[in-house]
């Protein structure tokens, strides 16, 4: 909104020189981060009190899991993702270029998945059960929205004449010449990336602060990636494909970081509120959509390797148990396995943060290793 105001004033004779700052992505990304942080922190205390009053017993805690969680975390309200999403959307409306197709595609995914997560959280809280919507219901809804968003990108996102067909191509990291055009099969691949990463973040959100910090690391990494591939000079220097308009997603990444910091203010151990599916599904979907827009889907698997590992641990556990009746891990997702081994919750969380930070640096390194 402010960016559009700047462009309107720039065409007149009344604009102030200070408004020229608005044309810089770096400035708007920083302001988006600050705005989202302020919104999340400002609404935090009142929102938490309201959620406690509305939810009563708070988020249901698994009774077959870590015993101390039942006593330590009982009564903690959920749906804290609303704080992050409020900051994200306010910041996006203020600082992003609202004519940009990529911005609206990411907001479509984020808002839709946030609504789906809210429905899941609401079902859990009202029924006081850890089972909300069925997995099939969530997956079908996620894939439908992701397919629609991907088709919009393919048809309407700006294209570079230097890289025809890139909108349906899969770009491999490190190997700069390895690009495979999947045609319309790319729609299924992109939808899987978005929905899969959304659920991976959701599975990781099981301990205080565990998911949100790796989300911020991933958002920082993809904010830089989006900025680079959206700038022809940087993309050419680094031998990256040029993706017109994708740089604007750096603003949304800044907003995710700011909203995440504001949420972490209240989610730091002992958590006063949980993110819930409202936040985890939305943020995972947002990162998946940003990776698709930037054509760095495979790099997301590296940067978000912690989330991928959490999801794989669940799939391995379920598949192996169905086949043999035995478990590979003491408990899945894998962060609970380490708790069962005797690691304190804070140790698990901080070590997982370290792993996610290392993976983020490795993901960034692929930009230069070509």
UniProtKB/Swiss-Prot annotation:
Residues annotated as signal peptide? none
Q: Provide the topology term for how it sits in the membrane.
A: Multi-pass membrane protein
Q: Where in the cell is it found?
A: Cell inner membrane
Record has Cell division as a keyword: yes
In its UniProt record, a GO molecular function of this protein is:
phospho-N-acetylmuramoyl-pentapeptide-transferase activity
- A GO BP annotation: peptidoglycan biosynthetic process
Give the pathway listed in the UniProt entry for this protein. Cell wall biogenesis; peptidoglycan biosynthesis
Has keyword Ubl conjugation? no
In terms of one coarse class, where is the protein primarily found? membrane
A GO CC annotation recorded here is: plasma membrane
Annotated keywords = Cell cycle, Cell division, Cell inner membrane, Cell membrane, Cell shape, Cell wall biogenesis/degradation, Magnesium, Membrane, Metal-binding, Peptidoglycan synthesis, Transferase, Transmembrane, Transmembrane helix
Q: Pfam families in the record, alphabetically?
A: Glycos_transf_4
Q: Which residues cross the membrane?
A: 24-44, 78-98, 103-123, 138-158, 177-197, 209-229, 245-265, 273-293, 298-318, 347-367
Source organism superkingdom: Bacteria
Q: Provide the family line.
A: Belongs to the glycosyltransferase 4 family. MraY subfamily.
Q: What does this protein do?
A: Catalyzes the initial step of the lipid cycle reactions in the biosynthesis of the cell wall peptidoglycan: transfers peptidoglycan precursor phospho-MurNAc-pentapeptide from UDP-MurNAc-pentapeptide onto the lipid carrier undecaprenyl phosphate, yielding undecaprenyl-pyrophosphoryl-MurNAc-pentapeptide, known as lipid I.
The protein's name in its UniProt record: Phospho-N-acetylmuramoyl-pentapeptide-transferase
Q: Which organism is it from?
A: Caulobacter vibrioides (strain NA1000 / CB15N) (Caulobacter crescentus)
